[in-house]
């Protein structure tokens, strides 16, 4: 039985520990280590709910990782890599390739990239967004040249719930796993907002390079809109806080903020309000009426605004600008049966895995490598 080493660009959190089934590996008597290289990739990164455990090793410099690899028997290790492939991480991937590491990618966010046409992608793109797209293309081109010159290899095996990824081993999206555990749905007496901790989410600051801005105007806009929703439907709005959020309790007015219970909150909600989020999958799986919402502050992030437009196109539902909204026109809706099934079987699960659990798929495959 080979040792499993997971290398992450973030400190280990409770959520990562859960969706990657780390405790199940350990209970199966697998020798397991988590190599935290967050301070090398994103110096200064700190997350809430960081986990401390004896199997965690922390590295702040690439030479430290090199030394660890040199002292390890890499032929007897399966490396699960949770580090974004980009120009910033190129030397890290070269190091793993130089040491002939067996690399496994486990894509837990298979609904991030949506299958929409090039024309639909370009239809509403602004000039500044085109410049950003060209910059990203140039970086990808440079990265591919670097990989070719330095013989940087791709993952040996990839697990993913997305049908868009060729050669994958099918698994389920983590949200589908949660849904499978408790599929019965009842109507509660509330609407739920799927919070993304905008504009303070660590990914926005560290990975997308967004400058920290005040959330006050953004939150004021949401509070005003939530008042209108509550007046129209006679039900409260509950906030499903993002796992990385740090709220004091007054950000959304006198409204309940719940963290770590998004699946249950969506399951029992009357309707779902969101910008764009991987958690949209819960709305679709539980077959809930939903509404995509935006405002002036949210639109300042062109990447997120573009992602929301793509989601709108993919799901065929409109985006409501809550700063200029006529509530008589506001009408959350469910997806049609065909649209719902297309999304579920394209991004969340497959006919082969919908009755299986990721824990069994991953343990069964990885322990045989």
Briefly describe each language-model feature range.
Residues 82-86, 276, 293:
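Short His-centered aromatic/hydrophobic patch
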Residues 79, 103, 158, 272-273, ...:
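Short, well-ordered beta-strand core segments
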Residues 176-246:
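Conserved catalytic-core segment of nucleotide-activated headgroup transferases in glycan assembly
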Residues 75, 154, 267-268:
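Alpha-helix C-terminal capping/helix-to-coil transition sites in glycosyltransferase folds
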Residues 54-69, 173, 180-181, 220, ...:
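Donor nucleotide-activated moiety binding/catalytic core segment of transferases
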Residues 278-352:
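Catalytic binding pocket for nucleotide-activated donors in carbohydrate/polymer assembly enzymes
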Residues 1-124, 200, 205-220, 224, ...:
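N-terminal pre-catalytic "stem/leader" segment of glycosyltransferase-like enzymes
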Residues 127-207, 364-369:
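A nucleotide-sugar donor-handling region in carbohydrate enzymes
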């Amino acid at each position: 039985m080979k040792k499993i080493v997971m290398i992450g660009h973030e400190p280990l959190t409770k959520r990562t520990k859960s969706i990657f089934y780390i405790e199940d590996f350990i209970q199966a008597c697998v020798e397991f280590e988590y190599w935290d290289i967050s301070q090398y990739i994103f110096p200064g990164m700190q997350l809430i709910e960081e986990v401390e455990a004896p199997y965690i090793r922390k590295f702040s410099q690439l030479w430290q990782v090199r030394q660890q690899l040199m002292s390890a028997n890499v032929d007897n290790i399966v490396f699960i890599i949770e580090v974004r492939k980009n120009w910033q991480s190129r030397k890290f991937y070269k190091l793993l390739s130089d040491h002939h590491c067996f690399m496994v990618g486990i894509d837990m966010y298979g609904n991030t990239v949506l299958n929409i046409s090039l024309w639909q992608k370009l239809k509403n793109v602004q000039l500044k967004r085109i410049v950003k797209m060209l910059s990203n293309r140039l970086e990808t081109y440079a990265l591919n040249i670097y990989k070719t010159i330095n013989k940087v290899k791709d993952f040996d095996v990839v697990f993913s719930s997305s049908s868009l990824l060729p050669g994958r081993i099918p698994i389920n999206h983590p949200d589908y796993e949660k849904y499978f555990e408790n599929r019965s749905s009842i109507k509660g007496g509330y609407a739920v907002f799927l919070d993304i901790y905008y504009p303070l989410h660590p990914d926005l600051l560290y990975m997308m390079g967004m400058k920290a801005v005040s959330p006050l105007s953004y939150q004021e806009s949401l509070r005003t809109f939530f008042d209108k929703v509550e007046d129209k439907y006679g039900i409260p709005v509950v906030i499903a806080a993002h796992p990385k959020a740090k709220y004091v309790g007054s950000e959304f007015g006198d409204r309940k903020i719940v963290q770590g219970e998004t699946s249950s909150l969506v399951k029992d909600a009357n309707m779902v309000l969101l910008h764009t989020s991987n958690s949209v999958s819960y709305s679709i799986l539980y077959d809930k009426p939903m509404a995509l919402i935006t405002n002036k502050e949210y639109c300042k992030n062109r990447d997120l605004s573009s992602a929301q437009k793509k989601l709108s196109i993919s799901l065929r539902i409109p985006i409501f600008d809550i700063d200029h909204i006529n509530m008589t026109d506001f009408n959350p809706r469910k997806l049609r049966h065909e649209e719902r099934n297309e999304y579920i079987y394209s991004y969340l699960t497959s006919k082969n895995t919908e009755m299986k659990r990721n824990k069994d798929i991953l343990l069964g495959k990885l322990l045989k490598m």
